[in-house]
A protein has these predicted regions:
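Zn-dependent metallo-beta-lactamase
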Residues: 1-16, 27-28, 74, 79, ...
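Binuclear metal-ion centers of metallo-dependent hydrolases, dominated by the metallo-beta-lactamase
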Residues: 4, 97, 162-217
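Pre-active-site segment of Zn-dependent metallo-hydrolases
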Residues: 12-48, 52-72, 86-100, 118-129
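Conserved beta-strand elements of the Class I
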Residues: 21-22, 48, 81-83, 104, ...
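Short secondary-structure boundary segments
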Residues: 25, 51, 140, 166-168
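Conserved acidic residues
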Residues: 45, 134, 161
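Metallo-beta-lactamase
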Residues: 58-109, 186-208
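Active-site-proximal loop/helix segments of hydrolase catalytic cores
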Residues: 91-158
Length: 217
C-alpha cells in the first residue's frame, strides 16, 4: 500500500490493485487563505469525509467519480471494508464543533485508521469498536483536535505500529495549532521521509511503534 500526504488531514491511499482512497479533501484557500496547501490534483475511487468543514469535505476537488463515504455505516467498496466510528470534534460531546467520524479501512491486509478531527481521548467502547490498528493517521496539532499528549495516548490504546501525524502547523497552514515537533518529542522512534509518500506492506510492519513524518505537496 502506498500512502501519500496531500496536506492537512488529506491522504491518498493506494492499494496494490490500484484502488485509490482520498481522506478528508480540503478546499485550498479556504478560511480566508489559512488553508494554503496546493489544490488537490489527484483522482480517487473512494473519498472519506470525517465531518463537514471546508478543510475536510471538499469532495469536488477530487478527480474522477469517487464514491463518497460519510457517517458510521459499515460498508465494502471495491473489495475494501470500511468501518466508521462516530466520535466528536471537541471535548464537549460535539457542542462546540459537532461530530467526527473515524474511518477504519483494511487495505492489502493492513488495518488503517484515519482519525479525522478527533477532539477527545477515546472511550473504551470507541477503542473496542476500532480494534487494533496497524497504521494510524492522527491529528497532533491540538486546539481544534487532540494534541500531542492525547495523540500519543490514542496511538497506544489502539496498538498502532506506524503512526503518521497530520493536522499540525506548517508553513502552508495559518491555523493556531502546534507543530509536529511537539508530538515527536514524546515519541521514541521517528522516521522523517524525504518526500510525500511511503510504501508499507503487511510483512514489513515494525515490531515496535514508529512515527513516520511525511512532507506535503
Amino acid at each position: 500500500m502506498k500512502i501519500k500526504w496531500l496536506g492537512h488531514a488529506s491522504f491518498l491511499l493506494e492499494s496494490k490493485s490500484g484502488t485509490k482512497i482520498i481522506t478528508d479533501p480540503f478546499e485550498a484557500g479556504s478560511y480566508d487563505g489559512a488553508v494554503g496547501y496546493a489544490p488537490i490534483s489527484e483522482s480517487a475511487d473512494i473519498v472519506t469525509v470525517s465531518h463537514d468543514h471546508a478543510d475536510h469535505n471538499a469532495v469536488d476537488s477530487v478527480g474522477g467519480t469517487p464514491e463518497v463515504v460519510r457517517g458510521s455505516e459499515d460498508r465494502q467498496i471495491d473489495g475494501i471494508p470500511i468501518r466508521g466510528v462516530s466520535t466528536f470534534h471537541d471535548e464537549s460531546k460535539g457542542q462546540d464543533r459537532g461530530r467526527n467520524t473515524i474511518y477504519l479501512m483494511e487495505i492489502d491486509g493492513i488495518r488503517v485508521g484515519h482519525l479525522g478531527d478527533l477532539g477527545h481521548r477515546l472511550s473504551d467502547d470507541e477503542a473496542a469498536a476500532l480494534g487494533k490498528i496497524d497504521v494510524l493517521l492522527t491529528p497532533v496539532g491540538g486546539y481544534y483536535t487532540i494534541g500531542p499528549d492525547e495523540a500519543k495516548e490514542v496511538a497506544e490504546s489502539l496498538g498502532a505500529k506506524v503512526i503518521i501525524p497530520m493536522h499540525f502547523k506548517t508553513e502552508a497552514l495559518g491555523f493556531p495549532i502546534q507543530p509536529v515537533d511537539d508530538f515527536l518529542r514524546l515519541m521514541e522512534r521517528v522516521e522523517r521521509v524525504e518526500g510525500t509518500s511511503v510504501e508499507i506492506s503487511a510483512d514489513d510492519l515494525p515490531a515496535e511503534p514508529k512515527v513516520v513524518v511525511l512532507e506535503y505537496e
